[in-house]
Structure formats: structure tokens, C-alpha cells
Design a protein with these regions (language model features):
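A C-terminal functional module that forms or caps the active site or interfaces directly
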Residues: 266-294
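Structural motif
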Residues: 31, 181-182, 242-248, 267-270, ...
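Conserved small/polar residues in nucleotide/adenosyl-binding loops
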Residues: 304-311
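Short internal beta-strands
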Residues: 53-59, 200-209, 310
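A short, acidic, amphipathic alpha-helical segment used as a generic capping/interface helix at domain edges
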Residues: 163, 248-256, 289-303
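A contiguous, basic/glycine-rich beta-loop/short-helix subdomain that forms a polymer-engagement track
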Residues: 212-264
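Hard-cation-handling environments
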Residues: 163-177, 181-188, 192-235
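His/Asp/Glu-rich metal-coordinating catalytic cores
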Residues: 5-32, 36, 42-180, 185
Length: 313
């Protein structure tokens, strides 16, 4: 680029497929399959199946392969190490959302503003993921899933204690406990806080692969068993079962009822909204999120060096 050519100020532009960097030849967290996807984390709404290449952290690559198959083409980047794509340099930095989740830092080779895309993020303490790291930048694109003042999370340890108390009460009455939550990240955060002294812990098949990846990364989790026909008797009454929301009301879940039936719960930040528990049709709602709440988002913005924030909703 000649010295008379203006330096582009918009390294990233929104398109139908997602945020696109023309100078780097990649999308960030595309909505549909693309040739090269720089992927902040392994949730399917950020890492759609079918991309020719995923550029991500090693732990995100492990999670993607556990979900989509070992043949997935993943180019892995270590924390803070710069990699050139076309006319830009890219590096990844911990986002605190789930294990391996990354913020994406982008800088043009010929100068101009530094951009950071947080992806989903949080700044809470979480033993199952790398701690959030602030990255100096000029333009900050930050997620805002819970970007309203109504969203305030209780301390995660308080919520996990409530879940254990609920489970123990149910077990004493020979009533099976079922907690629905998302299979990657949230489920492992929940598992890390469960007390195995109360009873056996069963997990849905969709959680088995991701949970094994977490264990391989030396994340401390209690012993679990795969919840199925062969383990139903062991789990009935005393056990707790962690499963995705798609298992609600299925014959699979009904087989685990104890002598006094079962109680169901949903663990999510959305449980902070009145009516969500009824909408989900569960007995209990526990406010446990892998996203920053309103104050968390404000705190994250304040950590940056005078950025120009852009809200991704």
C-alpha cells in the first residue's frame, strides 16, 4: 500500500456470514461455514460445523474435534503469539467465557487502530477456564448477551451451594435431581461445583466428549457416569443428572425417576428474568452464567485503554 493510500479504519465489517476482515481473508465467529474462521470458542453459534479451517486456541480445537470429529482442520494459536494473515497480525487472549475461549486482537501491518473482539466473555473467577485478560486497543467489539442493568449475578459459589442443598433435599426423599444446562462450558462449571458425597453424578451423552476434554486439560471435576439404561437404577432417587435442554420431557429422562419422582432445574443467566423458569417448565431456576452480567461488562470496558466500544448484542 502506497503512502498516499488512506489506512483503512474498519478492519472488520459486518456481513451476512458474520464479521469479515478483507485484509486478512477471514471471518470471526461466522454464522455459517466459511473457508477460514477465526473462532473465539467452541459453542456452535460461534464455531459452525463445516468450516474449511478453524483458527483457535489448542483447547478450543480439542473441543471442536470432540463435537465435530477428529478430522477437523484447526490452526492453533498460543496465547499472545502473533500470527500473520494477509495484511494483518492476529493474536488471541483469554476471554474467561469457557475453557479455551479467546479474545481476538487484530492490527494492520501498516499501522492504524488496534481492534479487539472479545467474543463471549466474563471476568468472574472460574476454576474451569483461563482468567480474563485485558488487551490494550483502540476499538473494542464486546459481546452484550446480558447487556441490560436488570442482569446481576449472585456469587457462583453461592449458587452452586444452593444446587447442592436442593440435590441433598431431593436425595433424602428418594427424588432424582435433573439440571439442564448447555453441554460445553456451563455443564463443566456446574460439575466442578457439585458435591459427590451427596450421591452419584450422571451426565448425558452430549456432555461426555467435552467433559473428557476438560479432564485431559487437568480441570478438576468429580467422578461422573454416563446416564443411560445401564446406569438408571444407580441414579434413581439419590443421583443428580446434568443434561442439555433438548433432553427435557423425553423418554430418556423419564427413566431416571426415583420413588418420589424427580425435580428438574435449569442453570442459566436467563433464570434472572421472571417467567423464564415457567417458560422452561422446570421446578427450579438457578442463576449460573458463563457470560458477564451488566456490571461485569462495564468493568471489562473500564479495563481497556480508552477504547471505542462497539456492542455486538
Amino acid at each position: 500500500m502506497s503512502s498516499s493510500t488512506p489506512i483503512p479504519t474498519d478492519l472488520l465489517v459486518p456481513t451476512a456470514k458474520g464479521l469479515y476482515c478483507e485484509r486478512g481473508g477471514f471471518f470471526i465467529d461466522p454464522r455459517r461455514p466459511v473457508a477460514r474462521a477465526i473462532t473465539t470458542h467452541a459453542h456452535t453459534d460461534h464455531a459452525p460445523p463445516g468450516c474449511d479451517q478453524y483458527v483457535c486456541t489448542p483447547r478450543t480445537a480439542d473441543l471442536i474435534r470432540s463435537r465435530y470429529g477428529p478430522e477437523q482442520n484447526c490452526l492453533t494459536l498460543e496465547w499472545g503469539t502473533q500470527h500473520q494473515f494477509g495484511e494483518v497480525m492476529v493474536s488471541v487472549h483469554p476471554a474467561g467465557h469457557i475453557m479455551g475461549s479467546a479474545q481476538i486482537r487484530i492490527e494492520a501491518l501498516d499501522g492504524g487502530p488496534v481492534w479487539v473482539v472479545t467474543g463471549d466473555c466474563k471476568d468472574d473467577d472460574d476454576p474451569t477456564t483461563e482468567a480474563f485478560e485485558s488487551v490494550p486497543c483502540d476499538v473494542l467489539i464486546i459481546e452484550s448477551t446480558f447487556g441490560l442493568p436488570i442482569y446481576h449475578w449472585p456469587e457462583p459459589e453461592t449458587v452452586l451451594s444452593q444446587i447442592n442443598d436442593w440435590w441433598a433435599t431431593n436425595a433424602a426423599q428418594e427424588r432424582t435431581s435433573v439440571v439442564m444446562t448447555y453441554a460445553v462450558g456451563k455443564a463443566q462449571r456446574l460439575l466442578a461445583g457439585l458435591d459427590p458425597n451427596i450421591g452419584p453424578i450422571g451426565i448425558h451423552g452430549a456432555l461426555v466428549g467435552p467433559t473428557e476434554v476438560y479432564r485431559a486439560a487437568c480441570i478438576e471435576l468429580p467422578e461422573t457416569i454416563r446416564a443411560g439404561r445401564d446406569t438408571a437404577t444407580e441414579l434413581q432417587g439419590r443421583g443428580i443428572i446434568v443434561c442439555p435442554p433438548s433432553a427435557a420431557g423425553t423418554p430418556w429422562i423419564r427413566r431416571f425417576s426415583g420413588k418420589d419422582g424427580m425435580e428438574t432445574a435449569f442453570a442459566s443467566g436467563w433464570m434472572a428474568v421472571r417467567g423464564r423458569q415457567r417458560w422452561r417448565g422446570v421446578d427450579r431456576g438457578f442463576i449460573l452464567s458463563d457470560h458477564a452480567d451488566w456490571n461485569g461488562l462495564l468493568n471489562i470496558c473500564l479495563l481497556y485503554t480508552s477504547p471505542s466500544p462497539r456492542d455486538t448484542g
